Regions:
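Single-stranded nucleic-acid-binding OB-fold domains
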Residues: 1-91
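Extended, charge-rich, solvent-exposed interface segments
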Residues: 84-104
Length: 104
């Protein structure tokens, strides 16, 4: 069961994430094998910093409904990649206005 995470700056590889973030960048990128579809590459931020994120499943659907500047609720897990880390997102949706404080 996901728990409310700390700020982005406090995340560590292996953490389960249930949080709200701002989308700074969103790009739909085809897999090397085009028959496999695409994944959604995101740059997410909060007041403490930013982190890369990926939506591997149903990426086209997510990309169609999300834009830079949207505040989203995400659920996923922090994973290592090369010299950094990213969030592998399992669920993502736009946050409702009553769910977030824009000061965060």
């Amino acid at each position: 069961m996901p728990t409310k995470t700390r700020l982005i700056a406090d995340l560590h590889v292996g953490d389960v994430v249930l949080s709200y973030c701002l989308i700074k960048r969103a790009r739909l990128i085809p897999f090397k094998d085009p028959a496999s579809g695409s994944f959604l590459s995101l740059l997410l931020s909060d007041r403490s910093g930013q982190i890369s994120a990926r939506v591997w499943e149903r990426a086209e659907q997510s990309a169609a409904s999300l834009n830079p500047g949207d505040v989203v609720k995400i659920q996923g897990k922090v994973r290592a990649y090369q010299d950094g880390m990213y969030i592998a997102i399992r669920q993502i949706r736009r946050a409702r206005p009553d769910e977030v404080d824009l000061a965060d």
